[in-house]
């Protein structure tokens, strides 16, 4: 081994000499001393790797962990040295680059006074050569580190591989040493959930896992609860407790359980501190003020009690019942709570500190609630608390049982003992629980804020419907006078789109007008029709009788009721086409306006407008100024028009006659 080491040293020294010559020929000032040093150290280090197996075989008695620690330390040192060397080389490169850049800028500024072409040429000449030179000069320092691994690459790779394997093995050993338990947690709904808990997890971490699994509200009252059925005791896990350590104290065949429950008394002191610090004043006034204490005073009281130089323990003292060792008898004694433990007043002594006797200290005990102590141990009441060492899992004389008179006293003593035992840690646990609950509430609020509020489609839809149904498109004023019949007629018009069914009860009149134009006489002009729209229907029957004697060629002026318009053929030849749209618009007002005086018929020869059916029918029924020449048609119309809203068989007969006359007329005209 010695000879091989010397040969390698000679080779490495010759290599370094050649590198020095190269650097001198290039005229670059590198730092030779730092460059050769790291590889030599690495080389010596690799030699140590070769001797590692021999040393391990020779020194089997030595501790493997100590050797591994030394090995890891050597590796880390070598890595740090290589990193430092690389940093130094990079710094040198940066310096060279800055110097060259400054030189280039100086030359460029000096030649700026010359012509533009000369400036460009000089700039290119000065700027272009440096870039190729920079990489060459910059690459020279890095090469020294790579050559040694090339020469000793196999050995170094083997050594590094071994070191990495050892590191992984150590990490796996550490991970394997971590205690892990599968815990079955009982829920308040009698269901269970299994969790994998390791010794690095605290009760707070387990609670967070349960919050994620159960999706509960994450308030501060949720806690892990420990129950001992054999001893009939139970307690709350503190958030800072190690769950695995506590469960490791259980026996293998134990019936103990871990529950996930809400307990309001867990942090009751932080919600109402006055009930624990100011409740034992002995005056009713103080109790009343305690009940009315505001949030600021509560916060001030908590800061004074938990955030000072020392923790203030509630001043609790009073008579409690103590269970005698190995017996079911209880003795009443006067106990006092102090930060170090519980003290009692011996018989015949006073409450002074020198006369007090120590009952128990809180360092190595946990506090539990008693379950059915009155039945099992003949306790005076069921309000009992128990103090025992966590490793005691069966009945023992070292378990202390104390009984209180009421539940309020019990809660005060239990909370006071917890404050004396855990101190400010208890307050820190509460603050973390509040922060966790606040975070959960914010997440839930973010999920609920984006939900759309339900709209009121009924009101909106009703408004839209009324808005569309009330106006008739062309005569909105007829809405109030028409009433429900008009709305029904309008809905029929929208759905069926039939002109004849424009109005519910007056649809037959519209059909009559469509069929009455069979008469060869021309209808009155459009203005007369509009005036007739306003005329009333009751005056029609008296005027209808008059025109019965009139001849066809000369219609009388007083004859209003007879059929108004001629056949559709004559309507097509009519000179006034605009009236058709107004009749539809003027249909509603036919019911309301009074009948105006009949207008004189001047344009008897003019043809009537083509599409007046709904409005014209009502106009004719309301005394149209120009009556038709047919004497037989008016009496039929008088019967039906005298009561426009009353349907009957006469209307059907009249309609059939009109249809027949219209068919004949159409057949004769072509």
UniProtKB/Swiss-Prot annotation:
Region (Disordered): 449-653
InterPro entries: GRB/APBB1IP, PH-like_dom_sf, PH_APBB1IP, PH_domain, RA_dom, Ubiquitin-like_domsf
Positions bearing Phosphothreonine: 534
PTM sites of type Phosphoserine: 55, 532, 537
Tissue distribution: Ubiquitously expressed with high expression in the hematopoietic system.
Biological process according to GO: positive regulation of cell adhesion; signal transduction; T cell activation via T cell receptor contact with antigen bound to MHC molecule on antigen presenting cell
Compositional bias per record (Polar residues), positions renumbered to this chain: 456-475
Biased composition (Pro residues): 553-567, 576-599, 606-615, 625-634
Domain PH, first and last residues per copy: 313-422
Location of this chain's protein in the cell: Cell membrane; Cell projection, Lamellipodium; Cell junction, Focal adhesion; Cytoplasm, Cytoskeleton
One GO CC term, this protein: focal adhesion
Membrane topology qualifier: Peripheral membrane protein
Pfam families from the UniProt entry: PH (PF00169), RA_2 (PF21989)
Domain Ras-associating: 179-266
Keywords: Cell junction, Cell membrane, Cell projection, Cytoplasm, Cytoskeleton, Membrane, Phosphoprotein
SMART domains: PH, RA
Quaternary structure and interacting proteins, as annotated: Interacts, through the N-terminal Pro-rich region, with the WW domain of APBB1. Interacts with RAP1A, PFN1, VASP and ENAH.
Function: Appears to function in the signal transduction from Ras activation to actin cytoskeletal remodeling. Suppresses insulin-induced promoter activities through AP1 and SRE. Mediates Rap1-induced adhesion.
UniProt similarity note: Belongs to the MRL family.
Protein name listed in UniProt: Amyloid beta A4 precursor protein-binding family B member 1-interacting protein
Annotated source species: Mus musculus
Lineage: Eukaryota, Metazoa, Chordata, Craniata, Vertebrata
